Amino acid sequence: MEIKTTAVAGTLESSDIQIMLMAGDNGIQIDLESDVIKQFGAQIKHVITTTLQQLNIDNVKVRAVDKGALDCVIKARTITAAQRALETTTPAWEVL
C-alpha cells in the first residue's frame, strides 16, 4: 500500500510514543528518538516494522519519538498513523 499523506499519531507525554509516517521509496526506514534506545530500541523498531508489514506498507519513512511506551501502545499508534496516512476509515481488523 502507498502512503498518500504525512500522518501523525500519539503524543509526547510520558508512557506514549509519537509516530509520524511519510512516503518513502526505499523500504521501511525508521528514525527513532528515545531515552531508552539502548535497552529497547531494537524492540521498538521491531514492533513498528512488524505492524507496518502486517498492513502491507513496504515503503515508508517513520519518525518515532518514544517516551516509554509499551508495545501495545506502539502498535496502536502505528496502526492509527498508518490509517491516517492511507486515508482510510475502515480499520484493519486482521492486524489487531
Curated annotation (Swiss-Prot):
The compartments listed are: Cytoplasm
Q: Where are the transmembrane segments?
A: none
Query: GO cellular component annotations, sorted alphabetically?
Result: cytoplasm
| Keywords, comma-separated and alphabetical | Cytoplasm, Phosphoprotein
What the entry lists under InterPro entries is as follows: CitD, Mal_deCO2ase/Cit_lyase_ACP
Q: Which Pfam families match?
A: ACP (PF06857)
Give residue numbers for the modification (O-(phosphoribosyl dephospho-coenzyme A)serine).
Answer: 14
Q: How does it assemble?
A: Oligomer with a subunit composition of (alpha,beta,gamma)6.
Q: Which family does it belong to?
A: Belongs to the CitD family.
Primary role: Covalent carrier of the coenzyme of citrate lyase.
Full protein name: Citrate lyase acyl carrier protein
> Gene encoding it?
citD
